[in-house]
């Protein structure tokens, strides 16, 4: 059977449901697919389809995630839903499911709970740009005043984490009633999706950003020069353009004299392409895995940064023992391991801790032995002897 072609006639946006356990994230996700399926914009899925999320591995970490897709009039969405709280933490920190925005699900019967707060904090820390609130289980609350109080509480909570609490839409829904086909509540799901369309900005396409390719391999072609291969992370590169080689050693300038993909010559390579770039005047010894090729002047290498880190439990293949400040692991950044040191850390809420236990989430300061192209929002893994013991996201560049 021929593979169905992915139609690119609508902008694509990645979103997900976040919020406290049992507030109805998965039921709401199922309800969205069912309501949109009636207009031919999704395949209807029930709770069980989504809840039985398969395991995935991302940077050596096992995560359960369910993926559904659907469309609205103006957009195509890929939507992620995670069964367990730990899956959310791992998913958001590893960037396994990069979110352009999220639907925060909060039950009107409970109001904001511990994980509601934790997911809002996590969304802020990993750079989820926009939220829409689905106030769920509204069919179970008769008193309009209670609903108003819960809405106020949610807005104050969003404000306290630097989201624009007053402006974020809060839509009253009942995932369960919509799933049962109650037309009043079905129309509320449509209202929610209109709010998502309007409030979650369309992401800048990777291809429109400045060029960057992490070097995976280097070889020389007799009579032609040195070729660096890798996947173009963003932007595009044309034959004849100047690019900089950044990281590990001093930054240097070179010219791209050829772009190859699947042994064919191209005029240009763009985001997502796996290419070989022929570089003028560069010896094989001058360039190595872990460096990046970038648009001139678009990026500088750094050695010191702050990060949000999830440290793997022993059962997940992580360490069996705690570590302390001064710990020297490898940081796996893009395509290579760089030795570094964790010079300081606090728990994720900013309180002081003496040591880090497997399973902890921390804020840490890291220092690398050589400068590499790190950027805010970038993901990395922490490794020890080739195995992953933690995953993180760069929250701030220090030096």
From Swiss-Prot:
Coiled coil: none annotated. GTP hydrolase that promotes the GTP-dependent binding of aminoacyl-tRNA to the A-site of ribosomes during protein biosynthesis. The gene is tuf. It comes from Prochlorococcus marinus (strain MIT 9301). Pfam families: GTP_EFTU, GTP_EFTU_D2, GTP_EFTU_D3. It is found in: Cytoplasm. One of its GO terms (molecular function) is GTPase activity. GTP binds at residues 19-26, 81-85, 136-139. Keywords: Cytoplasm, Elongation factor, GTP-binding, Hydrolase, Magnesium, Metal-binding, Nucleotide-binding, Protein biosynthesis. Residues 60-64 are annotated as: G2. One of its GO terms (cellular component) is cytosol. PROSITE patterns: G_TR_1, G_TR_2. This is Elongation factor Tu.
């Amino acid at each position: 059977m021929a593979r169905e072609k992915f139609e690119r006639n609508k902008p694509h946006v990645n979103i997900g449901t976040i919020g406290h356990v049992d507030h109805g994230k998965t039921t709401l996700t199922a309800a969205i697919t069912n309501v949109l399926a009636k207009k031919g914009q999704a395949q209807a899925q029930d709770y069980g389809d989504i809840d039985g999320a398969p395991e995935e591995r991302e940077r050596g970490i096992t995560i359960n995630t369910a993926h559904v897709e659907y469309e609205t009039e103006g957009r195509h969405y890929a939507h992620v839903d995670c069964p367990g709280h730990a899956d959310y933490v791992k998913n958001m920190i590893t960037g396994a499911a990069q979110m352009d925005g999220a639907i925060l699900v909060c039950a009107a019967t409970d109001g904001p709970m511990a994980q509601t707060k934790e997911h809002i904090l996590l969304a802020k820390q990993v750079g989820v740009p926009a939220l829409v609130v689905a106030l769920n289980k509204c069919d179970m609350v008769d008193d309009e005043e209670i609903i108003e109080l819960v809405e106020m509480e949610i807005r104050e909570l969003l404000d306290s984490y630097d989201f624009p609490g007053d402006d974020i839409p809060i839509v009253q829904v009942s995932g369960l009633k919509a799933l049962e086909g109650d037309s009043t509540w079905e129309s509320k799901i449509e209202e929610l999706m209109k709010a998502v369309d309007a409030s979650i900005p369309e992401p800048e396409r990777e291809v429109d950003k400045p060029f960057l390719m992490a070097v995976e391999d280097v070889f020389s072609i007799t009579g032609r020069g040195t070729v660096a291969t890798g996947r173009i992370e963003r932007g595009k590169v044309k034959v004849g353009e100047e690019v900089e080689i950044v990281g590990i050693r001093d930054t240097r300038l070179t010219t791209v004299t050829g772009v190859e993909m699947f042994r064919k010559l191209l005029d240009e390579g763009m985001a997502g392409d796996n290419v070989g770039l022929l570089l003028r005047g560069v010896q094989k010894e001058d360039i190595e895995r872990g460096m990046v090729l970038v648009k001139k002047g678009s990026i500088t290498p750094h050695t010191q940064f702050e990060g949000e880190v999830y440290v793997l439990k022993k059962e997940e293949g992580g360490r069996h023992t705690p570590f302390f400040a001064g710990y020297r692991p490898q940081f796996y950044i893009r395509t290579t391991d760089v030795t570094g040191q964790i010079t300081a850390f606090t728990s994720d809420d900013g309180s002081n801790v003496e040591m880090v236990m497997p399973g902890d989430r921390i804020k840490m300061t890291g220092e690398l032995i050589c400068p590499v192209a790190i950027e805010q929002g970038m993901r990395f893994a922490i490794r020890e002897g080739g195995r992953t013991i933690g995953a993180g996201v760069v929250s701030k560049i220090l030096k």
